[in-house]
Amino acid sequence: MSERKLFTSESVSEGHPDKIADQISDAILDAILAKDPEAHVAAETCVYTGSVHVFGEISTTAYVDINRVVRDTIAEIGYTEAEYGFSAESVGVHPSLVEQSPDIAQGVNEALEAREGQSDDFNAIGAGDQGLMFGFAIDETPELMPLPISLSHQLVRRLATLRKSGEISYLRPDAKSQVTVEYDEHDKPVRVDTVVISTQHDPEVSNDQIRQDMIEQVIKAVIPAHYLDEKTRFLINPTGRFVIGGPQGDSGLTGRKIIVDTYGGYARHGGGAFSGKDATKVDRSASYAARYIAKNLVAAGLASKAEVQLAYAIGVAQPVSVRVDTFGTSTVSESILEAAVRQVFDLRPAGIIKMLDLKRPIYRQTAAYGHMGRTDIDLPWEQLDKVSPLTEAVAALSEGA
C-alpha cells in the first residue's frame, strides 16, 4: 500500500481582525511613501470593538492624515455598518507615531561597510535589524506555490468577491478558510481531503443556505474538480453561528498572520512580519528577495522545490549568509546554486530596494490574501526575469567546477 500524507494550510479574509490591522499599517506606509519615498516607517496597528490604535516609529518629511487613512481602509474592507460593532465613520482612531531611534537610524543610514571606507553606493544602507528570512517555491501550482495555501487564499478571495458584488447578500467581512491536501508517496498532491470555511453572516440566514452557497458558489468555483471526490469533507461554519465577528469578536494586531502571508507552513519562516515596514526593514524586503530567488530557480528548471534563507546583521549591508535547499530536487549541486544566486542577485538592502523598486506605495494590496504567489496583482518579486541569468551563471559555474 502506497504511503499518503496530509498537509493543511489556512487563510483569512481582509475582514479578519489581524488582517484589518495589517491593511491599516500598510495603507499608512503607502500614504507616506507616496509623498516621501525615502521615509523610514514601522507602523503597528491594534483594532478592537470601536477603536483603532496606530503606534510605532517613522522618519519622514511627509504629512499624512492618519485618521482619514484608517477610516478609508476600514470602509474599503467593508466595515460600514454600525451593527457590525466596528464601522469606518464611528470608530475611534488613536495615533501615536514617534521618530525612529537615532541609534537604529545611524546603522541604517550608513552601513558598516560605508563606515569602513567602502565606496560602493549600495553599501550606504545597512540592514534595519538582524534576522533570518526565507523564500520558497515549488512546482505544485502555476504560480509556484504550495497547493494548500494557494487554494486557501482563493477561497477567501472568492468570498470577498461574492460579498462585495452583492451576489451573496448575507455575507459579512470576517472569514477564514482551511484546506487539507493529500499527497502521494512522491509528495505530489492528488486530492483535497478537507475544506473548512467559517464566514461571518447576517443573523437571519439559515445554516443550510450558507452550506449550500459555500459548496456550490465558493468551493466548487475555486477548487479544480479533479481534486474533489465523494470522500472530501466540507466543514462549513462548524460552530453553527458566526454573526459576531471582526474586531467586535476578537482584537487584531499587525503581524499576527505571518504564515498566512507566506507559504501556509509548508516552508520555514524567520519570524519577522511584513506589514507597516518600509523596505529598509529586511524582515520584509529580504523575504521578498528570497521568494524572487526561489521562484526563478524553480522556473528555470534548476529544482522542483527550493527554499532560500538569507540572514543579516543590523547596520551591515551584506547578508551574513545565503543558503539554498532544494530537498534533493536540484539538477546541480546546491553550492553551485548558491554561488549563482550571489552572482545574479545583489542582496544588500539597497540592492534589493533597487532590484525590486521597493520605494513605491505598493504594499496595501499585499496585506490580505498573501504576499507571495499573487496572480491578481503585479508584484516585482513574482517576476521571472532572472531565469536566463541564473541558467547562464549555473552553466558557467558547472563548467569551472
UniProtKB/Swiss-Prot annotation:
GO cellular component, as recorded: cytoplasm
Q: Where is this region: Flexible loop?
A: 100-110
Report the EC number(s), separated by commas if there are several: 2.5.1.6
Listed binding positions for K(+) are E44
CDD domains, A to Z: S-AdoMet_synt
Positions contributing to Mg(2+) binding: D18
One Pfam family from the UniProt entry?
A: S-AdoMet_synt_C
Q: Mind listing the GO biological process terms from this record?
A: one-carbon metabolic process; S-adenosylmethionine biosynthetic process
What keywords sit in the KW lines? ATP-binding, Cytoplasm, Magnesium, Metal-binding, Nucleotide-binding, One-carbon metabolism, Potassium, Transferase
Q: Where in the cell is it found?
A: Cytoplasm
**Does the entry feature the keyword Repeat, yes or no?**
no
Q: Which residues form the signal peptide?
A: none
| Catalyzed reactions per annotation | L-methionine + ATP + H2O = S-adenosyl-L-methionine + phosphate + diphosphate
Task: Summarize where L-methionine binds, as residue positions.
Answer: E57, Q100, D250, K281
Pathway-wise, it operates in:
Amino-acid biosynthesis; S-adenosyl-L-methionine biosynthesis; S-adenosyl-L-methionine from L-methionine: step 1/1
Cofactor notes: Binds 2 divalent ions per subunit. Binds 1 potassium ion per subunit.
Which cysteine pairs are covalently linked by disulfides here?
none
Domain of life where this protein originates = Bacteria
Per UniProt, the enzyme's principal EC class comes to transferase
Subunit structure, per the record?
A: Homotetramer; dimer of dimers.
Q: What is this protein called?
A: S-adenosylmethionine synthase
> Lineage from the top down?
Bacteria, Bacillati, Bacillota, Bacilli, Lactobacillales
* Gene designation per UniProt: metK
